[in-house]
Amino acid sequence: MVVVTLLGCGNASVNEGSQNPVRESEIIDFVFEDISVSVGTTVVWTNMDNKAHTTTSGVPPDVSGVWDSPFLKQSQTFSYRFTEVGEFEYWCRVHPFMTATVKVEN
């Protein structure tokens, strides 16, 4: 499931106690964070920068096809639900030096 919204959010947080756990992550100062979540968690990225970014699975310049957000303007969000165990590298198509990993465990 992929959802793009125009809502802002606060600091990064985890709500894994519910049936639909959510992990929030802010894109700020041209930096992505490494993220660890459980299977079934939805990660919600919020762009806090005044420049557009994407969150795109893969390693620059290759898109792996797992997820690829549209260009996110300031305060826009992108969500992706992780349904499989693994390590998923991701990057920004606008700024390929921005890279990080989502680690998904049982």
Place the predicted regions along the sequence by residue.
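Sec-dependent bacterial lipoprotein signal peptides
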Residues: 1-8
